[in-house]
Amino acid sequence: MINIHATKKLYAKLPAPISAPQSETTPLTPTLSLGEREQNPLSGWNANLLILQRRNCVLLVHDATRFPLFVKGLLKADFANFNHLFADALMNTLLKLGASQSQLDTAAALLAPCRFDTACDRSVQGTMNQMAGDLEHRLWFDNARLDDLSSYATGAWLSDRPCTVKGQKDCIWPNSAMLALLSRAGNSAPAKRNVIQLADYLSSRNG
């Protein structure tokens, strides 16, 4: 599972089957044991609903690395398809960062259904609020239209900053931290993997 801690504002937008714990697999779910899924290093995100230029957007921040994902222009039906939205945002943002083939393969193999709750972390939310503020300022300062903004490039841009993490002395850079996490996970993973076609994650959106 990919555990996502949603704000109440976002949680209220999710259909009941999505906001409830999910156990079913999807075509994106790798062949992992239950124990491996519970220890999934990609799991653990905080997420919030942003209203930008009257459009529903979601900003997610990975708890351990502070790596952000940005999803823009969601319609009501899109919230019921969050597994695909998450996978699409993750893979394409990693591509924008210049992730290696090995790192992309590891990320694809770790994808699993999203499970939502409202147990948000204040420290992660602090980072998320800073990123949201910077994004809003960028739209205002550049007089930019949300529709002209690449979700994936925006996520990569937001990740290129030092962030503080509670309990850690040194700052971390989310982009480097996420790539390092994927490298470690790939090195420790079993040799047998599903064959992943990265083209499945390439969106028709501007990115």
Regions found by a protein language model. Name each.
Residues 1-8:
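Low-complexity, highly charged intrinsically disordered N-terminal segments
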Residues 26-39:
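Intrinsic disorder/low-complexity segments
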Residues 18-25, 40-50:
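Short, basic/aromatic recognition patches
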Residues 44-81:
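A short, conserved beta-strand element enriched in hydrophobic/aromatic residues
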Residues 94-133:
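Cysteine/selenocysteine-centered motifs that mediate thiol-based redox chemistry or coordinate metal-sulfur cofactors
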Residues 145-159, 171:
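Long, charge-rich alpha-helical interaction segments
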Residues 168, 172-205:
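Short hydrophobic short-linear motifs embedded
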Residues 76-93:
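A short, polar/charged loop-to-alpha-helix boundary motif
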